[in-house]
Amino acid sequence: MEVSGPEDDPFLSQLHQVQCPVCQQMMPAAHINSHLDRCLLLHPAGHAEPAAGSHRAGERAKGPSPPGAKRRRLSESSALKQPATPTAAESSEGEGEEGDDGGETESRESYDAPPTPSGARLIPDFPVARSSSPGRKGSGKRPAAAAAAGSASPRSWDEAEAQEEEEAVGDGDGDGDADADGEDDPGHWDADAAEAATAFGASGGGRPHPRALAAEEIRQMLQGKPLADTMRPDTLQDYFGQSKAVGQDTLLRSLLETNEIPSLILWGPPGCGKTTLAHIIASNSKKHSIRFVTLSATNAKTNDVRDVIKQAQNEKSFFKRKTILFIDEIHRFNKSQQDTFLPHVECGTITLIGATTENPSFQVNAALLSRCRVIVLEKLPVEAMVTILMRAINSLGIHVLDSSRPTDPLSHSSNSSSEPAMFIEDKAVDTLAYLSDGDARAGLNGLQLAVLARLSSRKMFCKKSGQSYSPSRVLITENDVKEGLQRSHILYDRAGEEHYNCISALHKSMRGSDQNASLYWLARMLEGGEDPLYVARRLVRFASEDIGLADPSALTQAVAAYQGCHFIGMPECEVLLAQCVVYFARAPKSIEVYSAYNNVKACLRNHQGPLPPVPLHLRNAPTRLMKDLGYGKGYKYNPMYSEPVDQEYLPEELRGVDFFKQRRC
Ligand SMILES: Nc1ncnc2c1ncn2[C@@H]1O[C@H](COP(=O)(O)OP(=O)(O)OP(=O)(O)O)[C@@H](O)[C@H]1O
């Protein structure tokens, strides 16, 4: 069976929903990252809602609920509530719901905390890593938002309210007391953070130290723009982890360095750097007076493309200027829209750079594809993710705490105003890098959310406990970053490719009778938020295609599993699927029927000329005329014979063909 075709079930496509951790809005999992980019712009830090995750943290003995612990239950109402999603690849998840099964939680926990290999720290010797100079990037360049924050900009809501609180409470308790009361904190002020704050020398009842401003500064930097955008590199020097595509000795790199840009299709999973590479090409081409025009296939119309082409023609003929046209998500253009570029790419009016998360062999016109070089970008490796995160952490002036040196925090207990106000555990950086699953945008968004949520929860705690608001010496722990990530849409590709890869791996593992691998691929899909009914439908197919008559009850099992999933939904139905998958992996296999049927189909498709008529004796003869024409004549009614009947059932010209013996006609 081929499992690479799109899964198009509009009903199910409405179910694959996740919740935005900032605005709490439900949406298709595929949209969460782009939504977060917008949402972070719209919602100031004080409005982020870390409490949702934190509440769960309080309710569950095992600590904060990992994002991936979101459970789904299929229900009609959930389906009705959700808007339809545009593509099937983005479909198929139900409403998030907390699972309460202990065993299940345990397995998720182990997923959430991937071990660092042999306990080694991954944080590299980044040029500016662990420096304590707030607000500066590795390059020494300060992000615009930081610069603005440093100036006499209007004060934010949080800042003003914090000041008010301070005035109301007076010169009250400091952070030291906060530690003691940590258990009352509805937010994130958990034991480890309190401990660390004490270790930093944050105890004592003094007023907030001027260092608090640095935390404010960080918050303002993050409020203005998604961190992923702020950190988007302009040069290949800051572009990490894609050495196969643009490493030192690659053809593409030399072409970029000599500014000979061919038409390109950049293919890779979300957040791996497709747009960023185009951005780097753009920065480079501007230096060489090449026009760089960007369109997104999600909203551009064919006319927009025509306009760009027309202008490119003018620029070429009047000013001898080249135009590079970057089309994000090019797979969203249909075939005829893609045809619009074809002659213009061919004659060099435009250099096309398309970015796609989908396999271009299926999604991009063959003719267009043959005129472009396909660059395959991969999920960013963990080391590259750490480097990217460290670049951001340094630009925010956040200090990384070395967990192998427990005295480290103490060394920051002086009152120097140049000290960093915010700290992050090194293992938190590692965890973020792991859980981001090669998606730099997800990692940077996760970092941004963790920082904002930490600042915001600290503020909430101060408000509740009547203490003065002092965002100085805030510690970001591993748990904070886990909450900053929505694991369900990170471990499992929301754009489609991984969806088909995983179901294909499951199918092949069952076919190969590998029950371990079968269970692994099943869990990987379900834990990633796959729709259980999608998996169940595939099992129904497998039952006939691969097991067939070797064990006809497999089909009954699969249909029962499908119905069971339909009745009880996730998380309860996962064990039904697991049982079925293991049954199938262990079952004897037979493709006899499947291949014989394929032989019949091939026979029909390859037939030249009109198909042979149905033999007269096999035809029904409900009227006299038909009887007169010979319909049904000579037909031997089998029940009337005690012996096997010698009778031909195939058309005359197929006599002797045996589809079960691989004979094709
Ligand atoms: N290789 C990389 N090196 C450094 N930073 C990166 C890299 N890849 C991505 N990033 C960071 O992640 C952010 C998102 O990356 P980008 O927009 O390029 O992803 P994409 O592959 O185009 O994703 P999508 O398919 O979802 O549009 C960038 O703004 C940048 O900050």
Swiss-Prot record:
One of the GO BP terms on file: DNA-templated DNA replication
Ranges of compositional bias, category Polar residues: 76-89
Listed EC numbers: 3.6.1.-
Keywords: Acetylation, ATP-binding, Cytoplasm, DNA damage, DNA repair, DNA replication, Hydrolase, Immunity, Innate immunity, Isopeptide bond, Metal-binding, Nucleotide-binding, Nucleus, Phosphoprotein, Ubl conjugation, Zinc, Zinc-finger
Modified residues (Phosphotyrosine): 534, 562
Effect of residue 44 to A: Normal affinity for ubiquitin
Effect caused by changing residue 22 to A: Reduced affinity for ubiquitin
Binding-site list for Zn(2+): 20, 23, 31, 35, 39
Zinc finger (UBZ4-type) stretch: 17-44
EC top class, as a word: hydrolase
Tissue: Ubiquitously expressed.
Residues that bear Phosphoserine: 65, 75, 91-92, 139, 153
GO MF terms, alphabetically ordered: ATP binding; ATP hydrolysis activity; DNA binding; enzyme activator activity; identical protein binding; single-stranded DNA helicase activity; zinc ion binding
N6-acetyllysine, modified sites: 633
Low complexity bias (residue ranges): 130-155
Keyword Transport on entry: no
Pfam families: AAA, AAA_assoc_2, MgsA_C, zf-WRNIP1_ubi
Result, substituting residue 21 to A: Loss of affinity for ubiquitin
Effect upon mutating residue 40 to A: Loss of affinity for ubiquitin
Main localization (coarse): nucleus
Covalent cross-link Glycyl lysine isopeptide (Lys-Gly) (interchain with G-Cter in ubiquitin) as placed by the record, residue numbers: 81, 141, 225, 301, 310, 316, 322, 335, 482, 627, 633, 636
Presence of the UniProt keyword rRNA-binding in the record: no
Subunit-level organization: Forms homooligomers, possibly octamers. Directly interacts with POLD1, POLD2 and POLD4. Interacts with the N-terminal domain of WRN. Interacts (via UBZ4-type zinc finger) with monoubiquitin and polyubiquitin. Interacts with TRIM14 and PPP6C; these interactions positively regulate the RIGI signaling pathway.
Family listed: Belongs to the AAA ATPase family. RarA/MGS1/WRNIP1 subfamily.
Entry remark concerning the domains of this protein: The UBZ4-type zinc finger binds ubiquitin.
Name recorded for this polypeptide: ATPase WRNIP1
Lineage of origin: Eukaryota, Metazoa, Chordata, Craniata, Vertebrata
Gene, per the UniProt record: WRNIP1
